[in-house]
Curated annotation (Swiss-Prot):
Protein name: Probable basic-leucine zipper transcription factor C
Role: Probable transcriptional regulator.
Basic and acidic residues: compositionally biased ranges: 335-356
Region described as Leucine-zipper: 443-450
Protein keywords: DNA-binding, Nucleus, Transcription, Transcription regulation
Lineage: Eukaryota, Amoebozoa, Evosea, Eumycetozoa, Dictyostelia
Domain spans labelled bZIP: 415-478
Subcellular location: Nucleus
Top-level division of the source organism's lineage: Eukaryota
Gene giving rise to this polypeptide: bzpC
Length: 804
C-alpha cells in the first residue's frame, strides 16, 4: 500500500500508463543544447480527477496551445525527471448532462459497485473505470458521435508562470475546503486514484450544480486531500530544484479516439537536432506518427487530425478530445542521459580530484616531511631499513643494547655493526657539510666585504685622478707665460722632464767650461807622481870604514797643489841635463836633489806610444839586502833619467835635425869643458884624492858611452819595497831629518814606488820585473802595476855605485 512501485499495483492500469513506452515525449533528449537557459518549470507525480479539468475548461474559454519551438524549450528544459501529460477521452464529462438521467444512474451504480470491489481488494480501479467508461461509451454512442470537442492548450500563456504555480492556483480553493472538513475516514490506499467514481458521484448528486458545488463535494474526498498534500510537497521540491537549476524532460501523451480508450492514439513527435543555418529548415523538424498501444505498427487512422507536415518556427499542437483531459506527471530519467550525465560528473569529479592531488603534492613538497619518531624500546628487527636515514648513533646504540645486547649470531652482529658504521658515516658527512657551509658563508661574507672595499678604492682612485687632472690643468694655465714654455712639448709630465733635462745640461756645460780654464788638465790621466831619488853617503874618509855605508832614501815629491792644480805642465823635452842630476858628491856633506818648482819630470803620455795594462790593485813585495837594494834603486833612477833625455833628444832630432846637431855639438863641448875642469881640479887635488877621481871619470865615461835601445812601457803597476831593520846603519843627521822629501826606514817599514815597465827588456811584464833588481837567488818579488819608467842597463862585473 501507498507505493507506486509495489508488487500489489502491478496490474494497476495507471502504473502501466506511467511506464507506457508509447507516451509522447514532446521534448526530445537530443535537443538539450537549445534549452539550457530557462530550466525552472517542473511537473512531477501529479494525478488529478479529470472532472476538475473538464469543469474548469467548460467554464473558462481559455485556449491552451503547446508550442514546440523556443517558447516550450525555454519553458520546459531537459531534466532526468520526465513529465507526462495524459489526455484521454472521458464519457463522464459535464457536457453529458444533457443525456438521460437513467443512463447516468446506471453508470453510477456500476461505478459504485466497482469501486467497492476495488477498495476491498486493495487494487487500483482504473480498469473498472475503463470498463465503466466503455459501457458509458456504448450507451452514449449517439450522443458522443455528435460531440467532437477540440481543446487547444496554449502554453504561451504559461511562460510567465510555472506549471506548478498554475496547478496551485487551480487547486487552492480545493485545499482550503479540505482543511475545513472534519472527515476522519482517510483511505490508506494512497496510490489508488478513482477519477471516474468521483465524476459519477458528482453527476449523481447534482448534474446542474456549478463548479463551486462540485469543488465542495470534492473537498471531502480523503484521497483527493492526500493527493493535494502530495502536490504541495512536490511543489516545494520543484522550487528547490528550480533553485538548483535541475533540467527536466516532459512527455505529453495525447489520445484522440473517442470510442475506445484501449485503442487511444498517441502523438509521437520525432525531432531532429537543429544545427542553425546548416539544415534546410530554420527550425527543428518534427514528424508525428499515429499508433495505438496494442499495435504499434498498425496503420494510422484516416480521421486523425495529427497527420501534419513539419511545423513552422512557432507551431501549436491542437489536441482534440471528446470528453475530458487527464494530466499526470512522471519523473522517469532517460538511460542515455543518465550515462552522459554520469560520465560528465565522473570526469568533473576526476578532474577535481586530480587538481586536489596536485595541490596536495605541491603543499607536501613545500612542507617539511613529518616522519614518525624512532622508538628505541620497540623491536623492529635486525635490519632497520629506511630508518637508518633518520636515527642517530645514540638511538641505534640504545636500540642495540635493548634487543641485541647478548647477540651471538655472526650475521646479526655484522649487520648491526654495518648499520652503525653507516649511521656514523652519515653523521660525519652531515657535520662536514655543516662546517663547509659555515666556512663557505664566512668566505662569501669576506669576499663581499673585500669587493665593497675594492669598489670604494676604485671610486677613491677615480676621484683622486680627477683632482690631479684639475691641478695639472691649473698648473699649465699658470705656467703659460713662463720662460720655459718653448721647451715644453706634450703632456705636463713630458714638459717637466724636458725642463729638468735642460737645466742639468746647462749646469754641466757651465761647470766644464770653468774647470778647463781654472784648473790643470782634468781629463789627463797622467797625474803628478812621486819621484824618488836616492841619497848615497860616500864619506868614507871621515868614517874610515868602507863597509859601513848608510842607506838613505831621498824622496823628491810633488805637493798636492803641484800635482793636480797646476795650470801648465812641462813635457820631458824641456828638461835639461842639470835637472837630471840625482846625486851630488861632496866630501863629508850630504846634498839632496831639489825638485824644481815646476813638476818638469812628470811624464806626458803623449810621448809614450806603446802601453800595456796589467791586473789592477795587485800587490808587489820586494825584499832587498843592504847593498843590493841601494845599487838597484840607484841604477834604476839613473836609467830612468837617461832614458828620458835620450827619448827627448830623438824627438827633437826628428823635428829639427839642424838644431839637434848643434845641441849635440854643444853637449860634446860641455863634456869636454867639464872634463877639462875636472882634469884641472884633479891636477889641483892630486895629492888628496887621485884614485877616487879616476874612478869617477871612468864611471862618467862609461855612462855617457852606453847606448840605450828604444823601449815600450807598461802602465799601472805598484812595487812595495820592504827593508830589514838591520839595513839602517848609523845615525841620520838632523838636517836630513828636517827635509820633508827624505824618508827613512825603520823596523817593519815599507815604501812604495810606482814605475813604468820596459816591455822590451821585460816582455812578460811584472813576471820578469825581478830581473831589474835582483842579482842573487835569495831575492823575491811579485809585481802588480808600474807607472814610472824603468830601464835596465847591461850588467858589468866592475859596476859600482856612482856618486854623481
Amino acid at each position: 500500500m501507498g507505493d507506486f512501485n509495489s508488487n500489489e499495483d502491478n496490474n494497476n492500469p495507471f502504473n502501466n500508463v506511467l511506464y507506457n513506452p508509447y507516451i509522447v515525449d514532446l521534448y526530445d533528449t537530443t535537443n538539450n543544447n537549445n534549452n539550457n537557459n530557462n530550466n525552472n518549470n517542473i511537473i512531477s507525480g501529479f494525478n488529478c480527477d479529470s472532472s476538475i479539468f473538464t469543469q474548469q475548461i467548460s467554464n473558462t474559454n481559455n485556449e491552451l496551445t503547446i508550442p514546440l519551438t523556443q517558447s516550450i524549450q525555454n519553458l520546459l528544459p531537459p531534466v532526468q525527471q520526465q513529465t507526462q501529460l495524459f489526455i484521454s477521452p472521458n464519457n463522464n464529462n459535464n457536457n453529458n448532462n444533457n443525456n438521460n438521467n437513467n443512463n447516468n444512474n446506471n453508470n453510477n451504480n456500476n461505478n459504485n459497485n466497482n469501486n467497492n470491489n476495488n477498495n476491498n481488494n486493495n487494487n487500483n480501479n482504473n480498469n473498472n473505470n475503463n470498463n465503466n467508461n466503455n459501457n458509458n461509451n456504448n450507451n452514449n454512442n449517439n450522443n458522443n458521435n455528435d460531440i467532437n470537442t477540440s481543446i487547444d492548450i496554449n502554453l504561451n500563456q504559461l511562460v510567465y508562470s510555472t506549471p506548478s504555480q498554475q496547478i496551485t492556483n487551480s487547486v487552492q480553493p480545493i485545499y482550503q475546503c479540505a482543511t475545513q472538513s472534519t472527515t476522519s475516514n482517510i483511505d490508506t490506499n494512497i496510490n489508488t486514484i478513482n477519477d471516474n467514481n468521483n465524476n459519477n458521484n458528482n453527476n449523481n448528486n447534482n448534474n446542474n450544480n456549478s463548479v463551486n458545488n462540485n469543488l465542495l463535494s470534492m473537498c471531502q474526498d480523503p484521497t483527493l486531500i492526500l493527493q493535494i498534500q502530495q502536490l504541495l510537497l512536490q511543489q516545494q521540491l520543484l522550487q528547490q530544484a528550480q533553485q538548483q537549476s535541475v533540467p527536466l524532460n516532459i512527455q505529453v501523451p495525447t489520445t484522440t479516439t473517442p470510442i475506445n480508450q484501449q485503442h487511444q492514439a498517441l502523438l509521437v513527435p520525432q525531432q531532429k537536432q537543429f544545427y542553425g543555418n546548416v539544415s534546410d529548415n530554420s527550425s527543428p523538424e518534427t514528424n508525428f506518427s499515429y499508433a495505438s498501444p496494442s499495435s504499434p505498427s498498425s496503420t494510422q487512422s484516416q480521421s486523425s487530425p495529427y497527420e501534419q507536415q513539419p511545423l513552422s518556427p512557432n507551431p501549436t499542437i491542437s489536441l482534440s478530445s471528446s470528453i475530458s483531459v487527464t494530466a499526470t506527471t512522471t519523473t522517469r530519467p532517460n538511460a542515455t542521459e543518465k550515462t552522459k550525465e554520469s560520465s560528465l560528473k565522473s570526469k568533473s569529479k576526476s578532474n577535481e580530484k586530480d587538481k586536489e592531488r596536485e595541490d596536495e603534492e605541491e603543499d607536501d613538497d613545500d612542507r617539511p616531511k613529518k616522519r614518525k619518531k624512532f622508538d628505541k624500546n620497540v623491536y623492529k628487527g635486525v635490519d632497520l631499513g629506511d630508518e637508518l636515514l633518520e636515527i642517530t648513533s645514540e638511538e641505534f646504540q640504545a636500540y642495540k643494547n635493548n634487543f641485541f645486547a647478548n647477540a651471538s649470531d655472526k650475521k646479526t652482529v655484522s649487520a648491526l655493526n654495518y648499520q652503525f658504521r653507516k649511521i656514523k658515516n652519515r653523521e660525519s658527512a652531515r657535520r662536514s657539510r655543516e662546517r663547509k657551509a659555515t666556512h663557505v658563508d664566512e668566505l662569501e661574507a669576506k669576499i663581499a666585504e673585500i669587493e665593497k672595499e675594492r669598489d670604494n678604492y676604485k671610486k677613491e682612485n677615480e676621484r683622486l685622478r680627477m683632482e690631479l687632472d684639475q691641478y695639472k690643468l691649473q698648473e699649465k694655465q699658470k705656467s703659460a707665460g713662463s720662460i720655459f714654455d718653448y721647451i715644453s712639448i706634450g703632456s705636463p709630465t713630458t714638459q717637466n722632464f724636458s725642463k729638468n733635462f735642460g737645466i742639468i745640461l746647462f749646469l754641466f756645460l757651465f761647470g766644464s767650461f770653468i774647470l778647463t780654464n781654472t784648473t790643470p788638465n782634468f781629463f789627463n790621466t797622467n797625474n803628478g807622481v812621486i819621484n824618488p831619488n836616492l841619497v848615497y853617503n860616500a864619506n868614507s874618509n871621515n868614517n874610515n870604514n868602507n863597509n859601513n855605508n848608510v842607506n838613505r832614501f831621498s824622496v823628491n815629491g810633488v805637493h798636492s797643489t803641484q800635482q793636480y792644480f797646476q795650470s801648465q805642465r812641462n813635457p820631458l823635452s824641456n828638461l835639461d841635463e842639470d835637472s837630471l842630476e840625482s846625486l851630488t858628491a861632496s866630501q863629508g856633506v850630504f846634498s839632496t836633489h831639489f825638485v824644481p818648482e815646476q813638476p818638469s819630470i812628470l811624464l806626458n803620455r803623449e810621448s809614450i806610444r806603446n802601453w800595456a795594462t796589467l791586473p789592477q790593485n795587485s800587490v808587489a813585495s820586494l825584499s832587498f839586502e843592504k847593498d843590493n837594494a841601494l845599487k838597484t834603486i840607484e841604477n834604476a833612477n839613473l836609467d830612468k833619467s837617461k832614458h828620458n833625455v835620450i827619448s827627448n833628444l830623438n824627438q827633437l832630432q826628428q823635428q829639427q835635425p839642424s838644431s839637434d846637431e848643434l845641441m849635440i855639438d854643444q853637449k860634446e863641448e860641455k863634456n869636454c869643458n867639464n872634463n877639462n875642469e875636472n882634469n884641472n881640479n884633479n891636477d889641483n887635488n892630486k895629492n888628496s884624492d887621485d884614485e877616487k877621481g879616476k874612478e869617477i871619470e871612468e864611471i862618467k865615461r862609461k855612462s855617457t858611452t852606453t847606448t840605450i835601445s828604444p823601449t815600450r812601457y807598461v802602465n799601472n803597476s805598484t812595487i812595495s819595497l820592504l827593508v830589514n831593520p838591520t839595513s839602517v846603519i848609523g845615525d841620520i843627521p838632523d838636517d836630513l831629518m828636517k827635509n820633508s822629501n827624505v824618508t827613512t826606514f825603520g823596523e817593519n817599514s815599507s815604501f812604495k814606488f810606482n814605475f813604468l815597465i820596459d816591455t822590451q827588456n821585460f816582455p812578460n811584464g811584472s813576471n820578469d820585473i825581478s830581473k831589474a833588481f835582483f842579482d842573487n837567488e835569495n831575492q823575491q818579488m811579485t809585481v802588480t802595476s808600474v807607472i814610472i819608467a824603468i830601464q835596465k842597463s847591461p850588467k858589468t862585473p866592475s859596476q859600482q855605485p856612482s856618486t854623481k
